[in-house]
């Protein structure tokens, strides 16, 4: 039976949420072009679209907002943030950005410029959507080398975020000087929020360094990955989360971070460098016209203060055990109800295998997106597709290719919802499962050329 872990905090403030009728929700979804991204937030009862910037800050973070130094240059909040980065990660150089994609847009073009090959390529365990988009906007290719064990969602395996090291080595040999960087995504969002083992990070880093390839850590969910390493790897049992984090980042050369996840803030990102001062300076130059001056990067001083506090709060043992335990609780409720999910559950979300739940819907009609629409119609719960709609078309041929996954992500905001909300979500999805055979696929009315899933408009097939 699913186990409930109580929240390790008291609730000081509440925000009312509104339940609506099935008829109201159908009208709202039609007006949104059958795209949950385009729904009004006020029409959503429980919002599981993303964990990015949707969490609740602590009383200490709110107090930190009052300490904001809004100086255009040299803010003391920036200096505290840079000190926190040095303390936690051991990286000497910090550039704040408005969010993770801001870090990607100033870093990736410089890595492409440094690449010695004529057809630059970035390799990753699995690029997330915005990462892939920024790689391609920089004129490079994005190639994934994920362990094939992640593809069987019904089979439990502790490290479904790992690189397929044999494949990674083959690609490195085949591409040679074209490899601009290896990106280690922790946790691996597109595979189901799955962790990457320390041994795998170490091996990928060793391969990269043997070939002179820079290692970029996509660090959005670094603390959750460290928790999994401690819980699942006997070599790290009882080791402090902070020590595990420090070792993880020792294997990288730089990192990008959407701080809106494990930084526990509503806005913010980081682009940090261990010791490559020349690259740091080149990226700083891009920061000024794209993000803002180098000591604020599109952020208010108060937000940098909240981030400096949140980076440390996110390493708290009680918080992480509750956080990941709540996700596991929802996953277990769904398993008990016969809903197929990525097993074991990851750190930030439960990923429902829509290909198994809706086998009658082809990849080109986006089964996971159809399931997300049906869940909203059932109970006002907003989820998101991680599948063929998100994957997009092949950048050279323009053909729609099926994704290796057709997943619906139930993304749990941090410190926002209780276990009673998890029960409601599970009940709604189990009800949808009972009538799954009647769920229809979707086709485009409007298809944007880039990151289409955000603004596309669709209709039932």
UniProtKB/Swiss-Prot annotation:
Keywords: Lyase, Pyridoxal phosphate, Tryptophan catabolism. GO terms for molecular function: tryptophanase activity. It comes from the Bacteria. InterPro entries: ArAA_b-elim_lyase/Thr_aldolase, Beta-eliminating_lyase, PyrdxlP-dep_Trfase, PyrdxlP-dep_Trfase_major, PyrdxlP-dep_Trfase_small, TNase, Tryptophanase_CS. It catalyses: L-tryptophan + H2O = indole + pyruvate + NH4(+). SUPFAM superfamilies: PLP-dependent transferases. Its EC number is 4.1.99.1. Pathway: Amino-acid degradation; L-tryptophan degradation via pyruvate pathway; indole and pyruvate from L-tryptophan: step 1/1. The modification N6-(pyridoxal phosphate)lysine is found at residue 261. Pfam families: Beta_elim_lyase. It is an enzyme of class 4 (lyase). The keyword Nucleotidyltransferase does not apply. Its cofactor is pyridoxal 5'-phosphate. Gene3D superfamilies: Aspartate Aminotransferase, domain 1, Type I PLP-dependent aspartate aminotransferase-like (Major domain). Coiled coil: none annotated. Belongs to the beta-eliminating lyase family. Homotetramer. HAMAP family: Tryptophanase. This is Tryptophanase.
């Amino acid at each position: 039976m699913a186990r409930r872990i109580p929240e390790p905090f008291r609730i000081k403030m509440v925000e009312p949420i509104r339940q609506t009728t099935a008829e109201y929700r159908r009208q709202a979804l039609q007006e949104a072009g059958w795209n949950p991204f385009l729904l009004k937030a006020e029409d959503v009862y429980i919002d599981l679209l993303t964990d990015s910037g949707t969490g609740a800050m602590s009383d200490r973070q709110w107090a930190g907002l009052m300490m904001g130094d809004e100086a255009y240059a040299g803010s003391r909040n920036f200096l505290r943030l840079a000190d926190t980065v040095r303390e936690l990660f051991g990286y000497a150089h910090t550039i704040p950005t408005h969010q993770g994609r801001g870090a990607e847009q100033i870093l990736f073009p410089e890595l492409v410029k440094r690449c010695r090959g004529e057809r630059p390529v970035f390799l990753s365990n699995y690029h997330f959507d915005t990462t892939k988009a920024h790689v391609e906007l920089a004129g490079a290719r994005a190639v994934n080398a994920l362990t094939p064990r992640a593809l069987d969602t019904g089979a439990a395996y502790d490290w479904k975020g790992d690189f397929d090291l044999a494949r990674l080595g083959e690609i490195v040999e085949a591409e040679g000087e074209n490899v601009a960087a290896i990106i280690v995504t922790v946790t691996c969002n597109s595979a189901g929020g799955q962790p990457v083992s320390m041994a795998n990070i170490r091996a990928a880093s060793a391969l990269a360094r043997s070939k002179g390839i820079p290692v970029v850590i996509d660090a959005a969910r670094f603390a959750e990955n460290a928790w999994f390493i401690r819980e699942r790897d006997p070599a790290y049992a009882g080791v402090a989360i902070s020590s595990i984090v420090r070792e993880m980042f020792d294997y990288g050369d730089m990192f990008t971070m959407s701080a809106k996840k494990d930084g526990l803030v509503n806005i913010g990102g980081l682009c940090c460098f261990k010791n490559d001062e020349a690259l740091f300076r080149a990226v700083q130059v891009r920061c000024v016209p794209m993000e803002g001056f180098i000591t604020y990067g599109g952020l208010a001083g108060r937000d940098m203060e909240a981030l400096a506090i949140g980076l440390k709060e996110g390493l708290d043992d009680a918080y992480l055990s509750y956080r990941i335990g709540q996700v596991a609780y929802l996953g277990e409720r769904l398993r008990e109800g016969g809903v197929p999910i990525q097993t074991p559950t990851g750190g930030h979300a439960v990923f429902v295998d829509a290909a198994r739940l809706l086998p009658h819907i082809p990849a080109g009609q986006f089964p996971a997106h159809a399931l997300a629409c049906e869940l909203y119609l059932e109970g006002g719960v907003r989820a998101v597709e991680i599948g063929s709609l998100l994957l997009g078309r092949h950048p050279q041929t323009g053909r729609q290719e099926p994704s290796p996954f057709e997943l619906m992500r139930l993304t749990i905001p941090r410190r926002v919802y209780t276990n009673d909300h998890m029960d409601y979500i599970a009940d709604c999805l189990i009800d949808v499962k009972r009538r799954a055979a009647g769920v229809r696929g979707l086709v485009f009315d409007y298809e944007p050329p880039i990151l289409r899933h955000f603004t596309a408009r669709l209709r039932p097939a």
